[in-house]
């Protein structure tokens, strides 16, 4: 994104976007947990479905981002904090305009996938944030399960392998959903991901050659 375009879009960009999204997800989850009848009714009204859109419920084009990423009271705290931190990190690195565009392209991919398959969610949209953060900060450590330190790049590789498996064994709708919902990753981070793979390949090749030379 060039400077002139970024300057024009700056007035429309939402600063600290993930804060509002995480708060919305937290409110929906709290209603589902405390007042299930109202909470699940709200969940059904804000979810992204083709049938709902065809009935003119256009708010679903935006509100689906507020569906909580988990139904577990324990995991939801970790998930919301995690997504807030990586969203904040991306916005600090890119600026609010580029981060808004990245998130917006992910939303658009999710919407197109929903129109094709009948249903969409923010699962892959959230995953795209994780992949972006891992591409920018591959060596940063997080605590897996709150106690096991692991680098972001290894978590990203594990997730990528899992969704590659889903892509291979899943049906056409699964493949369409994965590709479209991760479109922002390919558009914004294709070069960074390729450079990271090349850097890691050179590292492991150098390490292998060094160990091979030491054994002689």
Protein language model regions, located:
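A detector for small-residue-rich transmembrane helices and their helix-helix packing motifs
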Residues: 1-216
């Amino acid at each position: 994104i060039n400077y002139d375009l970024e300057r024009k879009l700056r007035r429309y960009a939402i600063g600290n976007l993930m804060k509002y999204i995480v708060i919305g997800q937290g409110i929906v989850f709290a209603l589902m947990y405390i007042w299930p009848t109202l909470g699940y009714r709200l969940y059904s009204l804000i979810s992204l479905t083709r049938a709902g859109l065809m009935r003119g419920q256009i708010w679903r084009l935006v509100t689906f981002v507020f569906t909580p990423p988990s139904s577990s009271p324990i995991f939801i705290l970790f998930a919301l904090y995690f997504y807030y931190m990586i969203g904040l990190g991306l916005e600090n690195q890119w600026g609010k305009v580029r981060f808004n565009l990245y998130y917006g392209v992910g939303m658009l991919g999710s919407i197109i996938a929903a129109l094709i398959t009948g249903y969409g969610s923010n699962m892959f949209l959230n995953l795209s944030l994780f992949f972006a953060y891992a591409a920018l900060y591959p060596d940063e450590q997080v605590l897996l399960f709150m106690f096991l330190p692991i680098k972001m790049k290894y978590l990203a590789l594990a997730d990528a392998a899992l969704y590659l498996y889903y892509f291979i064994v899943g049906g056409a709708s699964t493949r369409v959903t994965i590709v479209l919902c991760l479109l922002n990753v390919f558009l914004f981070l294709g070069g960074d991901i390729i450079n990271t793979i090349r850097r890691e390949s050179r590292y492991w090749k150098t390490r292998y050659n060094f160990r091979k030379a030491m054994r002689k």
